[in-house]
Amino acid sequence: MKKLLATILALVMALGVTTMAWAEGDWTGSGTEADPYMITTEAGLNKLATDVNSGTVYSGKYFKLGKSITVTDWTPIGQKGTENKFAGTFDGNGQTVTINRINSSLDSAFGGYAGFFGAVKDATIKNLTVAGTINGSDVAGVVARLDGASKVINCINKAKVTGTSKAAGITVKIDGANVVIEGCTNDGEIKSDTVNGAAGIVVYAQGENFTINGCTNNGKISGPFVGGVVFNVSDSGSGIVKNCVNNGSVHSTNAGQNIMTAGIVSVNLKGSGLKIVNCSNTGVIEGENCSAICYSEYTNDASEPNTNSGEIKATVSRTISESTAVLNGDMSIGLTIHPYAAVTINSGNYSGSIESKGSLTVDGGTFIAGGNFYSSGTLVINNGTFARGVSVQTGTATINEGAFKTDVSCADNGKLTINGGKFAREIHASDTSTVNINGGEFTFNTNTNEVIDIKAGAKVTISNGVFAQENTNRFCPNNKDRLTVTGGTFVSDAMVTALMGEPINAPQATVVNGDKTMIAVGSAAIADAANSGKKVTITKGGEKIGRASCRERV
């Protein structure tokens, strides 16, 4: 009996000690993966912060949150600029830490970086939700700074985060190599008061080989420099952003500083060092220079397209960075099309400059004078009215129809094919470009300029088309040896002789169009004239053709 009483007393004392330890902020568990340190109180969280900030970083140790906890005057876990960075694994266990206030008196000691975690290195933070209000300099909901090969997995920020410098839902800065942020969501409102940036997931990514995968921003992002998922990938950063979504409104409040704003990554200084795949924007993007996915160029995998269904409210210029887009409305701002984007313009009035590095199809629209129209990708024009020059700089372009009131040019190693359309000014070919004219109506008639302008190295071939030029000396005054004419409809025998010489071996015919007589050379030109209802009489290389029988090519 005495032994039994002694045993019971020992158990009671042990339970009493355990209860006291919990009250003092200690944890249960041994810190292994199978038996992690279990934290269930504010005091327990404070103990972790105190230990890490004093140099005990718990490398290789495991922690689990046993219940949701509210903290006040919170001291972040880990410090920027020191070795006092959490290095273990923290499992939030689906629980929520609500932060009522960050201890602002510690701002300088933490280098301005604050959140639930201030700084971690080679750590894993997972399954954690942060709520409440977070204010400070460089602040985030979950972890302000990621060093080493840290991981943030399946974390959610619901806190309102306001930074006097930078603000993020998940992390302010990726500074280590091989950092992974996966399955994270921002539902909180994120605001930055300065030009240093705000974003739903990450403000600055400057570590090498980072991965941001399956993350979503649902919160409102506002400030001078902002991004939906990521604000800035620096020139020292590299990695991939994939399977991410921005559903929140992203509003740049700055004006006059040429600011870039986008739903997924606003600024990419790394160029091809950043890959964005299978991402989408549904939110409203508002600012000076806006894009759905990324304002800067990046690397894309065509098999994993990026998409946009959100409204883009740009005041200066818009970049189309999603994989496909259709434009129907008026646009007074500049438009840039990225190399991996395929865009169709169906209608609208466009007064801003257009630069296409991707695939652009124009099925209609009016392109007002004063802006540029450059293509260095793939361009197809099926219709439209162009009161500005069209310039093919590299790549390929095909014009099937449309009204061109000023010059069309091809440069560098570009290739331009003209199958139709009405052209009121010159056709220019320079550098090592190639221009093939297979049709179209060329109404330009000049005694001072030129219809076809060829610079050394370029080549122009004419197989068809109707040309109004009368002065034989001004049709192609430069580099005539680079011009080949095998057919077409011209104003006189003199034009035909000047372009092709005598004798003309191809079929030749007179074409009467109203009170005007022209000379058609070649089967294609004769058939086109006949099929358009004009009176055609073969004069060389064939027999007389009546209008009723002119539906076949000769």
PLM-predicted stretches and their roles:
Residues 7, 38-40, 218, 382, ...:
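A general, composition-driven signal for non-globular sequence regions
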Residues 318, 332-336, 351-355, 368-378, ...:
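Extracellular adhesion/carbohydrate-binding repeat motifs centered on closely spaced tryptophans
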